[in-house]
Amino acid sequence: NISQFGWVNALLILGVLISLIVPLAYVLRGKTEDHSAGRQQAETLLQILNRARQHSGYLYLTAGFFVCGFHVMFVMAHLPTFLKSHDMPPWLFGTAISLIGITNLIGTFTFGYLGDKYSKKYLLSTLYFLRSIVISIFLIFPVSVTSVLVFCFLIGFLWLATVPLTNALVGQLFGLKYLATLAGIVFCSHQLGSFASILLG
């Protein structure tokens, strides 16, 4: 850990581990079958980017992921300070973030599974709607240890469950050939939302 090795050595170790992704990706590569239309298969990157720019569904996904990033980082960055301002016990700060992380795993797998069974766009819409309800209720009612734990459990369940649904929808709209590029642009919007939440918070 950082306290044992120092931050410089910790970053070097992290860099070495991340660099292993390149040879592993080469070994694990395979031909991906793309069942999208033949017209999509023949499109160049510039053509697909131009089509994505004009596609309302893709623009909605990008805007939604901006809001997702805003939600996620706003809670992560400002929840401890919010709890402190309400005189919550110090142990609750770390417990709250940990609970979000644990339930995030459950929620992501759950919505990923449901995305194979039901309409992804309706699941994603429901997820964003539930987030707004959970956050609103938490802010309306008095803050207590119980309300914080319930909030963290629920918001954690909805935390990054948007990711498998959003990426799958991008793949459905444009095929798999340029999925990494198009999903990366959507994710960039997520990061901009995260930045905005820190800046405005």
Mark where each language-model region is.
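Helix-loop-helix hairpin linking two adjacent transmembrane segments in secondary transporters
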Residues: 1-33
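Interfacial helix-cap and linker-helix signal at transmembrane-aqueous boundaries
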Residues: 1-5, 83-84, 114-115, 200-201
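Flexible cytoplasmic inter-helical loops of multi-pass small-molecule transporters
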Residues: 29-47
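Extracytoplasmic gate region of multi-pass secondary transporters
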Residues: 53-113, 163, 197
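Transmembrane alpha-helical cores of Major Facilitator Superfamily
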Residues: 66, 98-102, 129, 184-192
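Juxtamembrane helix-start elements in MFS-like secondary transporters
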Residues: 88-97, 144, 148, 179, ...
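C-terminal transmembrane helical hairpin of 12-TM major facilitator-type secondary transporters
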Residues: 100-104, 108-169
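A late C-terminal transmembrane helix in Major Facilitator Superfamily
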Residues: 160, 173-201
